[in-house]
Amino acid sequence: MLHYELEKKKGSSLYEELYQKLKEDILRGRILPGTKLPSKRELARDNGISVKTVLSAYEQLVVEGYLYSKEKKGYFVAAVEAMPE
């Protein structure tokens, strides 16, 4: 289960916060390549946010190459160069 403390900050949206936290976890190697991420509904429920917020964050990470999706399977972490802690 991925749980993040998200709070909307002035000038940013919840989707941007979630996107940044997921991206950081991927780059720091906390979420390893090939890992299946929670479904949009599951992550939304666990973090008290909307499915649309999760979808927006996931889609941005796909566009940037951090995630890839498999139809009817979900979202997975792509192989990216990890940053040192």
Question: Model segments located where?
Answer:
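N-terminal basic, amphipathic alpha-helical segments
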Residues: M1-E85
